[in-house]
Amino acid sequence: SAAGRRPRGTVSIIEDIAFREEVLGEALEQVRGVLSDYGYGNAVMWGHLLDGNVHFTIFPDINAQEGIDHYASFMRSLVDVVLYYDGSLKAEHGTGRNMAPFVKDEWGEEIYELMWKIKRLFDPENILNPGVLLNRDPDVFIKNLKQIPLANELIDKCIECGFCEIQCPSRHVTLTPRQRIVIYRELSVLAEQGKTISKRYKELKRAFN
């Protein structure tokens, strides 16, 4: 897959946006321009053009603050293009924390506050998907990002999506494939930090074996 061929140490981020038919071609040219400007020219794009729905996958390097800042600038530029063409920031898939900070930009202050009012009526304690659909933190989409450390040339191809787990014959015997890879990556990080005698390392090593 494209994700398996991405540069080592990068993550795979998938988004989907939508435009009206009459502006779709021009809008897509602008989206491709933004992708290229930010070094994501190798993005994989596909979609359902009759619905104006476009998916894309990019592979940013977020292992350092510079990469995170670069990704943040890309997202803001992408949102600007979508809003300029009066498009939708989400099409088939849920909003999620990656787009939540931009919901207000898309719908405007009045409708956004109405959304919050409805949210408080049904979820006064904010326990249902807090911050996933509505979030007042403008930087939430670049916080608590899951980085993928270098561990092994083969394992580095994995994006931890879990799609392989249902087919794995060992998933009910020991660890699932994703669990094993996550532990392997953490062991690699701890070893690089010289923490091979730590309690955490020993516990993970025991689980891995």
How does the language model describe each region?
Residues 18, 44-46, 55-57, 88-91, ...:
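Structured core elements
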Residues 51-55, 62-66, 96-101, 128-129, ...:
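Flexible loop/turn segments at secondary-structure boundaries
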Residues 101-150:
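Activity-critical C-terminal alpha-helical subdomain
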Residues 2, 15-22, 44-47, 62-69, ...:
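Alpha-helix capping and helix-loop boundary segments enriched in small/acidic/polar residues
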Residues 1-73, 79-81, 85-86, 96-97, ...:
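C-terminal substrate-recognition/cap domain of FAD-linked oxidoreductases
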Residues 69, 134-155, 165, 171-209:
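Ferredoxin-type iron-sulfur electron-transfer modules in oxidoreductases and energy-metabolism complexes
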Residues 29, 54, 76, 80, ...:
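Feature representing long, continuous alpha-helical segments
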